[in-house]
Amino acid sequence: MAAPVLGGFFFYLHLKNMEPGRGTVIKSTGNLFIVKLEDGTTVRCGIRGKFRIQGIRATNPVAVGDRVGFEWAEDGMGGIITSIEERTNYIIRKSPKLSKEYQLLATNVDLAWLMISMILPRTLTPFIDRFLVSAEAYRIPVIILFNKTDLYGTPEVEEMNHLSSVYSSIGYRCMQMSLQTKEGVQEVADEMRGKVSVIAGNSGVGKSTLINILDPAMRLKTGSISDYHQTGKHTTTFSEMFELSSGIRIIDTPGIRGFGTIDIERAELFHFFPEIFRASKHCHYHNCLHLHEPDCAVKAGVESGNISESRYINYLMMMEEEQGKYR
């Protein structure tokens, strides 16, 4: 049962005696935010225009996961957010409409789950590595979760095993799951329990379905796969934190095609590829960018097979993206 939402004329009568409130943002829809108080009640909150533009280069300065302070609105229908507590971390993406702005997807995250699939829809490595770079930059632990394993033939199994080997060797934990057969679901639930998790991945990879299986009472809308484009139709247009009956808290994020490397200097990008960063300590030049420089330990690592070629190619791709794209 959903928590009650405060508001209405009867509540307005008591506003003058109310102290400013504090809570956690559990839902974001444009300029409207649902804030959950410690007692379980929820309050609809907005933000003042001047609060939105005070040096914040985000289209939404408040995001799901934020711990905020608010004042009760004069009309008695909710509150106005006035402050945001310092964040432990956050996940961002490029704004769909403003290329020089970014959109906060989630904050104060304990664990990020990157759901991927080798089929329907197939997740590409540039998507994976862009997400991992952002997670590294903002210090969010990641588990790579392979879904739809019941649909895999020999080529898909081989690709999954290869990617698992690549990312496990770097230090990322990889797990496998089939939402159709429920294989691996309990292991995922055990890992999520007691944490605030964010689930990211291409639309259609199974994010909403996973939440429904973990707690059938949620009944989230799920999308079908487009036969023509093999891309899931977007079913989540806002971010929301779900508190499941099993003690699991999940932030469901909008369907995304890629994450931006906002606030990461080009010369520092390799810092967020752990294996490239480790190898860089042996480069001849201390300011080596691992592009065309001589005596580059990173390029030597790629040639020897110690560094994944696909990872290095994705690094080069991100380095070559036009200047100013993420700034």
Predicted regions and their residues:
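Positively charged N-terminal leader segments that act as targeting/secretion signals
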Residues: M1-F10
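C-terminal effector/interaction modules appended to NTPase cores
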Residues: H14-E136
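Helix-rich effector regions associated with P-loop NTPase G domains
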Residues: E19, N31, R57-D75, E86-L105, ...
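Conserved beta-strand/loop subsegment of P-loop NTPase cores
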Residues: V109-I116, R139-T149, G171-Q176
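Arginine/glycine-rich "motif VI" loop of SF2 helicases in the C-terminal RecA-like domain
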Residues: V133-I140, V166-S169, R278
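Canonical P-loop GTPase G-domain recognition
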Residues: L151-V205
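A conserved segment at the C-terminal end of the G1
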Residues: S208-L220
